[in-house]
Amino acid sequence: MTKYALVGDVGGTNARLALCDIASGEISQAKTYSGLDYPSLEAVIRVYLEEHKVEVKDGCIAIACPITGDWVAMTNHTWAFSIAEMKKNLGFSHLEIINDFTAVSMAIPMLKKEHLIQFGGAEPVEGKPIAVYGAGTGLGVAHLVHVDKRWVSLPGEGGHVDFAPNSEEEAIILEILRAEIGHVSAERVLSGPGLVNLYRAIVKADNRLPENLKPKDITERALADSCTDCRRALSLFCVIMGRFGGNLALNLGTFGGVFIAGGIVPRFLEFFKASGFRAAFEDKGRFKEYVHDIPVYLIVHDYPGLLGSGAHLRQTLGHIL
């Protein structure tokens, strides 16, 4: 008889839940709920379990916020809870709450070739460190290392490191944004809101008044080639993505590969392929050759957060991935 665990991927807007076959890691019965419709995460979980009529005693939920102890307060939502209390209330034997990019990193060993698009570099070196990052509402970052037959995720808040310009244009962008918001982190330019910041700074650098555009507007106009400013912003976004990815590769010697997740890049995939991303990734001066063979992959799996939550839980329960 198949034994299932509950897995989840929860952001500021939606909560996606599914079942994970503990033996195989296969994800099934995925369903997305609007967070605004429920008073708590526990309430959403109860609705899901009632709908699917499956006995579940183990669970792992990935959440887009730092996890530092028993009490979890979501960054972009009003939900807050005690992990121990929710575990008790649900009658679970085991409940893990992990960072969303911990989950994405743990999905990487489970991915197949059809879930990946490669952008340069050679083949990954087995057993070497891995980096994963992704732009969405914010900029998530994690590393993954293989130690004693186990995968160990190293999450953090790497999206909040300083934005490090490496061209005259980027330096002007930094100057304009610093005057507006003070500290300029990488997330301030590599995210949905970050794309808007790039567009606004590009226009303001020419002493013009920017339009009130959303990320979707900028992307659409750039792809339609109907707005030079939007196209410049999207091109610069791709270049800075490359620089940031190259920095991650240098930090930990990620010869196991650098992986891109998040919902933004797939929306302009062909544009990204033709952009200066890879050249910027390798633009490391004396260490250009060091990063030259490090492969970069775009993750195109539908549910990497669910897949990784399942992998994390299965490994915790003693399975070898």
From Swiss-Prot:
Q: What is its EC number?
A: 2.7.1.2
GO BP: any one term: glycolytic process
Location(s), subcellular: Cytoplasm
Q: Which InterPro entries match?
A: ATPase_NBD, Bacterial_glucokinase, Glucokinase
**Main subcellular localisation:** cytoplasm
Q: Is Transferase found in the keyword set?
A: yes
GO CC field: cytosol
**What Gene Ontology molecular function terms does this protein carry?**
ATP binding; D-glucose binding; glucokinase activity
Q: Which Pfam families does the UniProt record give?
A: Glucokinase
Going by the entry's taxonomy, the superkingdom of the source organism is recorded as: Bacteria
Entry keywords, A to Z:
ATP-binding, Cytoplasm, Glycolysis, Kinase, Nucleotide-binding, Transferase
This enzyme catalyses: D-glucose + ATP = D-glucose 6-phosphate + ADP + H(+)
Residues that bind ATP, according to the entry? Answer: 8-13
NCBIfam families reported for this sequence: glk (TIGR00749), PRK00292.1-1 (NF001414), PRK00292.1-3 (NF001416)
Show the PANTHER family listed in the entry: GLUCOKINASE
Recorded family membership: Belongs to the bacterial glucokinase family.
Q: What is this protein called?
A: Glucokinase
Q: What is the scientific name of the source organism?
A: Shigella flexneri
